[in-house]
Amino acid sequence: MSASPLHAPPLGPQLKRWRALHRVKQSHAAELFGVAQSTISRWEAGLQQMSPGERATAERLLAARLDSAGDHALARLVAGSAGRMHLVCDLTHRLLACSPARAAEFSQPLSMLLGTSLWRYATPAIVRMETALDTLGWHDRAGPPSVEFDTGANASRVVPIRGSLCRWTRMTLSDGSAARLVETL
């Protein structure tokens, strides 16, 4: 798989939520992106797509970061869990935290994978589910329902995925960015 999803969801709703949480006016957001205020409005309304450069700027702005004590507590809960689970940025799929059981499946040390996107290891079933998230309102709401699906398997030795039932739960972090808890059931 490539480093990023084949189907990149519009970032307008997330940008609007980020602006509201951080009390950023459209005019200031326009300055950050180097565009007109009306462009920000069209992005947020879903009327205009971002260019690749604008999207990269938005992804840097909206990417999940473990900034607060609560965010770090969530990462510690995942890292201390007996279950097979990991936490990724919902937007970039960068690995934020991982349980020992999940880390034991990897052929590289966890320290080498933390902060890197796991998308390249996605199975076709994971790609299909990622694409279907838009129709479920996954990116439009702060706390959509969890989704469960069969993952299929990949042939990776670095991050092997064996066919199993998986649950994705989207969580909003303290800065308004979204993380995804990935659990093997």
Where on the chain are the PLM-derived regions?
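A short, Lys/Arg-rich alpha-helix, primarily the initiator
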Residues: M1-A20
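Sensory/regulatory domains in signal-transduction proteins
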Residues: G83-L185
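Short alpha-helical DNA-recognition segment
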Residues: R23-S41
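Key DNA-contacting residues within the recognition helix of helix-turn-helix
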Residues: K16, A30, S41-R42, S51
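Residue-level detection of the helix-turn-helix DNA-binding "recognition helix"
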Residues: A20, G34, A45-L47
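Short, basic/aromatic recognition patches
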Residues: D67-R84
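DNA major-groove recognition helix of helix-turn-helix/homeodomain DNA-binding modules
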Residues: Q49-D71
